[in-house]
Curated annotation (Swiss-Prot):
Gene3D superfamilies: Ribosomal RNA adenine dimethylase-like, domain 2, Vaccinia Virus protein VP39
Similarity remark: Belongs to the class I-like SAM-binding methyltransferase superfamily. rRNA adenine N(6)-methyltransferase family. RsmA subfamily.
Gene Ontology CC terms, in alphabetical order: cytosol
Pfam families named among the record's database cross-references: RrnaAD
Organism from which the protein derives: Mycobacterium sp. (strain MCS)
Compartments reported by the entry: Cytoplasm
Protein name (database record): Ribosomal RNA small subunit methyltransferase A
Amino acid sequence: MTIRLLGRTEIRRLAKDIDFRPRKSFGQNFVHDANTVRRIVSASGVHRHDHVLKVGPGLGSLTLALLDRGAHVTAVEIDPLLAQQLPTTIADHSHSEINRLTVLNQDILTLMPSDLENQPTALVANLPYNVAVPALLHLLAEFPTIRSVMVMVQAEVAERLAADPGGKDYGVPSAKVRFYGNVRRYGMVSPTVFWPIPRVYSGLVRIDRYETSPWPTDADFRAQVFDLIDIAFAQRRKTSRNAFAEWAGSGNESARRLLAASIDPSRRGETLAIADFVRLLQRSGEAEEQVRVQ
């Protein structure tokens, strides 16, 4: 039996059958266009050997398409009604693929590796505006087995995630996601392919985790790097010397550490790439050690 994807009429009929009304607080807008669904799944690079963590499966459009690729899917849905309905929908529109689906009714921000029987190798997510960045950073940190990410978010969030250093959209999210891997845009998604129709465009972003990380990835090191990123963007128009003065203990010490990391102290924090923040932390530790030895 070939998997049948959900169209607009089917999605609305299914919602009516289970007496479901989309909730804005959960960012519930469901893709009903088959071409868009196939485009997203194709761009994700998911194949039959993957175990996919699907965040926000909703009524099941993307989940069906992921199963159609032969992947195993763990779908995490915060809405209890949708989580309860999803296995039935998958069974009705496929055949043996239901055996490759696991559904959890849980808040993604609380999900931990111990909650899953199989650790995911890929993440496909449709994230609402208010939790997009925290959820993405949480999953990247807690699930190092995830090698690739395809996320659909509001267009402005997509622009921030994929922005380059020095650009107007470059900020804390841009720098932090690059701690984990390479980031690139995969185009826009029109509001008209959703039900209900949102007021804004969505954007697709793919993240590929570094094959071998250029820097340590332990939680303590990551937290220190992220602290530097937060400091730099708290007053993004300040020079790096002034921005890091309190952290370093003085303006002069800030300049010394920046120079040790081959960073011009007059540069603004908004121009620093993730490698700059990492180098600043590492060279600062080396500089402090040299001072103690002297």
